[in-house]
């Protein structure tokens, strides 16, 4: 299952059982400055970036990042020359995005637009604009009904455009409790869909097949799916601490994780998966 400590975050109105309020206001520092600064955060950003580049058209194509948080995934695309619109419902997270954006070159800043809106209202928020790529990473797992959001993702993609979704892998739910030696929880997790994340936020997982059906029914042809992280997860839950300042080690881990994300059986054991599809012609 995806967790807010490691991934993008959901619409506050759709979190399982949560209604109203910006619950991410109290988690933003830990989310932005903690999780993404860890080796796992660095690996996640690198692996997803490389996977995206295998499918995106060349810059300056337009990219919409729905639930994009502080821009950890889409700002590197802006640095690579893409025109990025980051949409997020949390004012606090958007403030974090602005702070990070100010540290980037002026040319990159001019390629980024920040919008405060729920993902379920994405099409209206962007005034009906269509994008060469629509990203939604770590959001679906916090919605009891993902269909309205998926509908918006697919509607915002241009014909031939890419839809990129990362969410929790329902077929790997036992990994975390087993690595934490919570054996009763691990046994129950084989058939579970819900869990409470490390920050106490509840969520659910999907299968690749289920999300593939969701986008296919909305005019987007599934193209390929990947894992995202595997070994780094096992190290963390096994109690191994890694130094994010050791750039050589982080790069070596990222290279291994990228290769594992493409291959069976490794990708099947990743606790999250990354599905990419392409919008069919109108």
Predicted feature residues:
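Conserved class I S-adenosyl-L-methionine
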Residues: 2-59, 72, 76, 93-96, 162-190, ...
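Class I SAM-dependent methyltransferase SAM/SAH-binding core
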Residues: 64, 72-122
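A conserved beta-strand element that flanks and buttresses the S-adenosyl-L-methionine
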Residues: 135
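Short catalytic micro-motifs in class I SAM-dependent methyltransferases
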Residues: 138-139
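A short glycine-rich, Lys/Arg-flanked "PGG" loop and its adjoining helix->strand segment in the class I
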Residues: 147-162
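Short alpha-helix
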Residues: 202-219, 225
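Conserved Class I S-adenosyl-L-methionine
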Residues: 224-282
